[in-house]
Amino acid sequence: SIELQLPWLQYCFGDVPIVAALIPSPLIAMIEDDGKRTTTEEFITELKKILGEIGGTTFYVASADLSHVGQQFGEPRSVDDQRKFDVERHDREMLSKYIENDAEEFVSAMRWNNNATQWCSIGNMSALLKLVDPEGIELVDYRQACDPKGIALVSSCSMALL
């Protein structure tokens, strides 16, 4: 979702068209497929086509939280310094897969570890790689937000797709 970025986008770009899309996780199978839904691949293909026809400059935002750990997220113990360290190591390992600009490898790595730290928005992150096909990806910043009692930690980062 882009609700946190929306005021910034409107401030920077003014009254421009904004299209938001909710992309499902590639790690979770659809409960039932009636054949009436557009697949992620179909969506990406059509969006590329439409944007190509329209022309101009497109600014993409893929908003995602990374890890969600601690008792608030169903883990048995609170978040201590060791857990923070382990989460950052895991996050940076998964981010390195993303920075390789291979959506399938990124999803495969997340599937292999069963999304152990409960990342959100793996779908939109991998879809963005397929949509944009950047020449490079730069990790700009990485942060962890942990409540004072260690009940919950959520990590996030900012990246630039060049």
List each model region and its residues.
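Active-site metal-binding loops of divalent metal-dependent hydrolases
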Residues: 66
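Flexible, D/E/H-enriched segments
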Residues: 1-57, 69-162
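Residue-level marker for buried hydrophobic side chains located in beta-strands
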Residues: 60-62
